[in-house]
């Protein structure tokens, strides 16, 4: 069936116009100009932490503007390609136009989803923690599978990731792991993954080959910015140091470089052992602790509102996705009902369709 290119391109232009309106390009350009002025100040690097915040935000705003404005050019180029192909009755060029149309539609959909990320912290980088829950060794193995899935997703997108801490289980898998995804809007995107994930499969660890159901929890936090003013007094934190350990509990470091921070008022505990020095591990652990305290404050505020409304739907312990490998293969989001049969691709990080569905579902719930 022949593609109705004029209708398709008209739909693209309508969506693109809506994206430009929602994105408020004038405000982005003004912010970019202000950031450029601040970045050019000779005194910028007198405060390295503030300088890094400015340069990171500058890069993010510039990338956002480029992404939106270049999309308009791609739609224009597509229209020209279609006109030339139809005038010359060139089948190869029309096939090329069809390929380009599909690519533009996919990227425009991703851009449209980005406009839905308007929450207070959505533009931040993300700190992800995965914990094995019920299910014994299978749960630990599942937690490691999820960790790899998210790291592969970040790799596929060209995002930098940094593993802060990994607590290995004795037989296989991990008890828990914490890592950062350093990319604009990583928090807004990955926060829809928060909750309990369920795996159903024939256990590779069961001698009788029985089916096993196991669970793992995913927590996603925004990286704290200096503007959040999350101050942690030294007298409220106990610092313990120990040797880093690997799979099976084996020591992987001959010095006490791993760090455990305990926030005494709340009891929150954070560990970091993957950096090279104790100082680096302490700094990374403090970033995670600040993120957890920021999230605790947000949840406390939300709990007050939920108590007034009688709403307890915000619990991150709710099951949100099932991964079934036996007796059939299916990954299904229990909130959106979106499902995919190619389970291997999902575990290899191809989760954009789930993320998009989750973001749209969340936005609908807010409206």
From Swiss-Prot:
Coiled coil: none annotated. It comes from the Bacteria. Keywords: Cytoplasm, Methylation, Protein biosynthesis. The modification N5-methylglutamine is found at residue 250. SMART domains: PCRF. Its main location: cytoplasm. Methylated by PrmC. Methylation increases the termination efficiency of RF2. It is found in: Cytoplasm. PROSITE patterns: RF_PROK_I. GO terms for cellular component: cytoplasm. The keyword Protein biosynthesis applies. InterPro entries: PCRF, Pep_chain_release_fac_I, Pep_chain_release_fac_I_sf, PrfB. One of its GO terms (molecular function) is translation release factor activity, codon specific. SUPFAM superfamilies: Release factor (SSF75620). The keyword Cytoplasm applies. Peptide chain release factor 2 directs the termination of translation in response to the peptide chain termination codons UGA and UAA. Belongs to the prokaryotic/mitochondrial release factor family. HAMAP family: Rel_fac_2. This is Peptide chain release factor 2. It comes from Kineococcus radiotolerans (strain ATCC BAA-149 / DSM 14245 / SRS30216). The lineage of its organism: Bacteria, Bacillati, Actinomycetota, Actinomycetes, Kineosporiales.
């Amino acid at each position: 069936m022949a593609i109705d290119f004029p209708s398709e391109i008209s739909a693209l232009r309508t969506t693109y116009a809506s994206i430009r309106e929602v994105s408020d390009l004038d405000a982005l350009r003004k912010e970019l100009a202000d950031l450029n002025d601040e970045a050019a100040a000779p005194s910028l690097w007198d405060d390295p932490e503030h300088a890094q915040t400015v340069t990171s935000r500058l890069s993010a705003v510039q990338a956002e503007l480029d992404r939106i404005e270049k999309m308009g050019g791609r739609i224009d180029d597509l229209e020209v390609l279609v006109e030339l192909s139809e005038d010359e009755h060139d089948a190869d060029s029309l096939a090329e136009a069809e390929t380009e149309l599909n690519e533009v539609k996919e990227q425009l959909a991703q851009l449209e989803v980005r406009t839905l990320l308007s929450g207070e912290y959505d533009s931040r980088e993300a700190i992800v923690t995965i914990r094995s829950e019920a299910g014994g060794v299978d749960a630990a193995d599942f937690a490691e599978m999820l960790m790899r899935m998210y790291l592969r997703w970040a790799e596929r997108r060209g995002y930098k990731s940094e593993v802060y801490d990994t607590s290995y289980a004795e037989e296989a898998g991990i008890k828990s792991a914490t890592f950062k995804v350093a990319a604009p809007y990583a928090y807004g995107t990955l926060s829809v993954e928060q909750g309990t994930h369920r795996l159903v499969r024939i256990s590779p660890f069961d001698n009788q080959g029985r089916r096993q159901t196991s669970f793992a929890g995913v927590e996603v936090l925004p990286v704290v910015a200096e503007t959040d003013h999350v101050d942690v007094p030294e007298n409220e934190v106990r610092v313990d140091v120990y040797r880093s350990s690997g799979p099976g509990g084996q020591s992987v470091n001959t010095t006490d470089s791993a760090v455990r921070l305990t926030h005494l008022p709340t009891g929150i505990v954070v560990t970091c052992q993957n950096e090279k020095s104790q100082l680096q591990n302490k700094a990374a652990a403090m970033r995670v602790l600040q993120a957890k305290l920021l999230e605790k404050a947000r949840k406390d505020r939300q709990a007050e509102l939920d108590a007034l409304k009688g709403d307890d739907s915000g619990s991150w312990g709710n099951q949100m996705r099932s991964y079934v490998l036996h007796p059939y293969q299916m990954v299904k989001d229990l909130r959106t009902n979106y499902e995919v049969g190619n389970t291997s691709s999902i575990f290899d990080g191809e989760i954009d369709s789930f993320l998009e569905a989750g973001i749209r579902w969340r936005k609908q719930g807010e409206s």
